[in-house]
Amino acid sequence: MRLERLAVNKIKVFLTFDDLKERGITKDELWQDIPKVHDLFRDMMLEADDELGFKADGPIAVEVFALPAQGMVIIVTKGHQESDFDEDGLEDGYIEMQVTLDESDEVFYEFADIEDVISLVPRLVTLGMTGGTLYSYQGRYYISFTDLDLDGIDEESLIALLAEYGYPSTISTYRVAEYGSLIIANDACIKLYQSFFKART
């Protein structure tokens, strides 16, 4: 389980499928109202309090994103009781959760710096990955891999490499493509490799 603060009232939690498996939870059960899911959310909130000082002391909205071969990203947002959420059900200190489930068919990763992307590229090329589309948006960098890009690639190894340098993105590719800047449309990995590494040999 990895936690990251996105804003004063918002955190991102990344759970691998191993994290879920250890608790006997499938991705389809994650949004269901069952005791083991309650236990998971309680543990998440305790860890968020310990690590980030994020206290779930009122209504929260929970967005769950399923990422293929990667795990689940959970966005937890605290609401303002007066406006964002209905106050019904809060009398007993119950945490109200509004859950949204979304599933993506692509691999889409976010990086803090272009240097992270450049450092990653030779390792991806060694793995056989030549494709991908590179974007920038709000000072961060994003790589998208389609099913065609992933054909013949060991996805577990790919995800392990990507996770060393970046994070699964919870922003959709559509948003980044529409509001961000397209840097390399196709074959981003091999083009970056040829630009930054082949010239040195």
Swiss-Prot record:
Complex and partners: Homodimer.
Keyword Cytoplasm: no
Domain notes: The N-terminal domain has binding sites for ComK and probably for unfolded/aggregated proteins; the C-terminal domain interacts with ClpC.
GO BP annotations, alphabetical order: establishment of competence for transformation; negative regulation of establishment of competence for transformation; negative regulation of sporulation resulting in formation of a cellular spore; sporulation resulting in formation of a cellular spore
Family matches, as Pfam families: MecA (PF05389)
Record organism: Halalkalibacterium halodurans (strain ATCC BAA-125 / DSM 18197 / FERM 7344 / JCM 9153 / C-125)
TM helices/strands, residue ranges: none
Described purpose of this protein according to its UniProt entry: Enables the recognition and targeting of unfolded and aggregated proteins to the ClpC protease or to other proteins involved in proteolysis. Acts negatively in the development of competence by binding ComK and recruiting it to the ClpCP protease. When overexpressed, inhibits sporulation. Also involved in Spx degradation by ClpC.
Family, as annotated: Belongs to the MecA family.
Keywords per UniProt: Competence, Sporulation
Protein name: Adapter protein MecA 1
Keyword Cell membrane: no
PANTHER family: ADAPTER PROTEIN MECA, ADAPTER PROTEIN MECA 2
Gene3D superfamilies recorded: 3.30.70.1950
Top-level taxonomic group: Bacteria
UniProt GO molecular function: protein-macromolecule adaptor activity
